[in-house]
C-alpha cells in the first residue's frame, strides 16, 4: 500500500489546501493519504477557529483518508519542534512512503541542500555562524548570512538563499527535511509550489485566499455566502450549517480576559516556558496591565527580537497551563502514540497496516491513564472549551473518531 502524508493546520481549510491534497495524490500516486493536523491551537499562536473534530471531518470530506492529531505541545512550538513532532509520529507508523509539503520555491533539491547543511553544520559554517553571532546579530539573520557566504561560489544559490529563508513555507519545509534526516527516515519528501495569497494577507482574493483573510472576514461579517468561492464546497456547506446552529468561531480576542485574570490572580510563572527568554516575562506582565485586546497586547510585547507568532504561542501556552510542565524533557522525546480524529474506509485499512508494522499506541478513545503529552492535549481542549460553546469540558473523553463511509475520493 503506497501511503502519503501531509502536515496541516486547516485554520480553516480553503481552496489552497484542497489544491495541496489533489497535487499530493497526483505527485506521489498514493493509494491513501494520511493527514497529521494541529488540534484546537495552531502554530502561529491562535486558538483554531473550528474545533479539531470539525476540522478533521472537513478534511475527510475533501479527500484525506485518515486524520491524526498533532499533539498540542508541538502545534504550539517553533517550526523546528512543530516539524519534528509531526515527522517523528509519521516515521514511527512504519507505513508512510512519502510526505508532501507546500513551499514558495517548489524545489526539493535546494531545500534538501540547505537542510543538510543546517543539520550537519560543517566546520566552515560553524565558524561563519559564530563570527556573525559575536557581532550581536540575531540567530536567524546570522544563520542566513553564514549560509550565503558558505555558498558564495554558487552565485545563484548565494543570491537567493536569503529570500528562500525569509519565506515561511520554505522554512517549515527545511525543518521537515531536517527531521527526516535526523530520524534517518525512509519517507521520501516531495514539495509543491504554494499557490495563492501569503498567509499574512488579510484580503480575499480570487480562488486562493489565505486562511488569515477568511478568519478576518468571519470575524467581521455574517454573510457566509461571500466565502463560497474561497472554500471547498463541502467546507462551505459545513460553515453554513455551523452558522445556522449558532456555532462559536474561536478567535484570539476571546482569550484575553482569561489570560489577564490568570495574571492578576498571581500566576506569574511565565519564565518556565521555553520561548520565554530572560526579561520577556516581565515585558508580558507589564503589557497585561494595560492591554485590553489581544492585538494590542501582542503589539505591546512584540519587537524585532520577539516575533508576533512567538508571542502568540507563549500566550496560548500560558492560557492552557504549559508552564506547569517540564517542556524541555517532553520535546527531547518522541511521541509514542497516535490519536485518530477521523477516517474513511480507506483510512481504516491504513490503521490495519499500522497495527501490523508498528508498535505505536493507537488511540481512538482515551485511556484512563494518560501520559504527560496526552494530558496536555486534554488541558488544551478544556481551555478551548472556554472559547467555544460547542465544546464541553473533558470533551476528549466523550468523542470518538468520525468514520465517514462512501466518500467520493
Curated annotation (Swiss-Prot):
Pfam families: HIGH_NTase1. One of its GO terms (biological process) is tRNA modification. Keywords: ATP-binding, Cytoplasm, Ligase, Nucleotide-binding, RNA-binding, tRNA processing, tRNA-binding. It is found in: Cytoplasm. It comes from the Bacteria. InterPro entries: Rossmann-like_a/b/a_fold, tRNA(Met)_cyd_acetate_ligase. Its EC number is 6.3.4.-. Its main location: cytoplasm. Signal peptide: none annotated. ATP binds at residues 7-20, 102, 169, 194. One of its GO terms (molecular function) is ATP binding. It catalyses: cytidine(34) in elongator tRNA(Met) + acetate + ATP = N(4)-acetylcytidine(34) in elongator tRNA(Met) + AMP + diphosphate. The keyword Transport does not apply. GO terms for cellular component: cytoplasm. Catalyzes the formation of N(4)-acetylcytidine (ac(4)C) at the wobble position of elongator tRNA(Met), using acetate and ATP as substrates. First activates an acetate ion to form acetyladenylate (Ac-AMP) and then transfers the acetyl group to tRNA to form ac(4)C34. Belongs to the TmcAL family. This is tRNA(Met) cytidine acetate ligase. It comes from Clostridium botulinum (strain Okra / Type B1).
Amino acid at each position: 500500500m503506497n501511503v502519503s502524508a501531509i502536515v496541516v493546520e486547516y485554520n480553516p481549510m480553503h481552496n489552497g489546501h484542497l489544491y495541496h491534497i489533489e497535487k499530493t495524490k497526483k505527485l506521489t500516486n498514493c493509494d491513501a493519504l494520511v493527514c497529521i493536523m494541529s488540534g484546537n491551537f495552531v502554530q502561529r499562536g491562535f486558538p483554531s477557529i473550528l474545533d479539531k473534530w470539525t476540522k478533521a471531518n472537513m478534511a475527510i470530506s475533501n479527500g484525506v483518508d485518515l486524520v491524526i492529531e498533532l499533539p498540542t505541545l508541538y502545534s504550539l512550538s517553533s517550526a523546528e519542534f512543530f516539524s519534528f513532532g509531526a515527522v517523528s509520529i509519521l516515521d514511527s507508523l512504519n507505513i508512510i512512503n512519502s510526505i508532501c509539503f507546500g513551499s514558495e520555491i517548489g524545489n526539493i533539491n535546494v531545500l534538501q541542500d540547505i537542510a543538510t547543511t543546517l543539520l550537519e553544520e560543517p566546520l566552515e559554517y560553524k565558524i561563519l555562524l559564530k563570527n556573525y553571532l559575536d557581532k550581536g546579530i540575531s540567530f536567524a539573520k546570522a544563520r542566513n548570512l553564514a549560509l550565503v557566504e558558505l555558498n558564495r561560489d554558487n552565485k545563484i544559490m548565494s543570491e537567493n538563499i536569503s529570500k528562500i529563508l525569509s519565506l515561511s513555507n520554505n522554512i517549515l519545509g527545511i525543518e521537515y527535511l531536517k527531521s527526516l534526516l535526523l530520524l534517518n527516515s525512509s519517507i521520501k519528501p516531495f514539495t509543491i509550489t504554494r499557490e495563492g495569497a501569503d498567509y499574512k494577507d488579510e484580503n480575499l482574493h480570487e480562488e486562493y485566499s489565505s486562511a488569515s483573510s477568511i478568519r478576518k472576514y468571519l470575524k467581521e461579517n455574517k454573510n457566509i455566502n461571500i466565502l463560497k468561492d474561497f472554500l471547498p464546497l463541502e467546507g462551505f456547506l459545513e460553515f453554513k450549517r455551523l452558522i445556522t446552529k449558532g456555532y462559536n468561531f474561536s478567535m484570539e480576542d476571546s482569550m484575553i480576559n482569561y489570560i489577564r485574570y490568570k495574571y492578576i490572580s498571581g500566576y506569574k510563572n511565565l519564565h518556565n516556558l521555553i520561548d520565554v527568554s530572560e526579561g520577556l516575562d516581565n515585558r508580558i506582565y507589564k503589557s497585561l496591565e494595560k492591554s485590553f485586546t489581544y492585538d494590542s497586547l501582542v503589539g505591546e510585547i512584540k519587537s524585532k527580537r520577539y516575533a508576533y507568532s512567538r508571542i502568540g504561542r507563549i500566550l496560548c501556552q500560558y492560557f492552557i497551563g504549559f508552564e506547569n510542565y517540564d517542556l524541555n524533557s517532553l520535546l527531547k522525546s518522541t511521541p509514542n502514540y497516535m490519536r485518530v480524529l477521523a477516517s474513511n474506509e480507506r483510512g481504516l485499512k491504513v490503521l490495519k497496516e499500522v497495527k501490523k508494522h508498528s508498535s505505536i499506541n493507537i488511540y481512538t478513545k482515551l485511556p484512563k491513564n494518560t501520559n504527560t503529552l496526552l494530558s496536555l492535549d486534554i488541558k488544551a481542549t478544556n481551555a478551548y472549551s472556554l472559547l467555544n460553546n460547542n465544546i464541553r469540558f473533558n470533551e476528549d473523553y466523550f468523542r470518538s473518531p468520525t468514520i465517514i463511509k462512501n466518500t467520493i475520493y
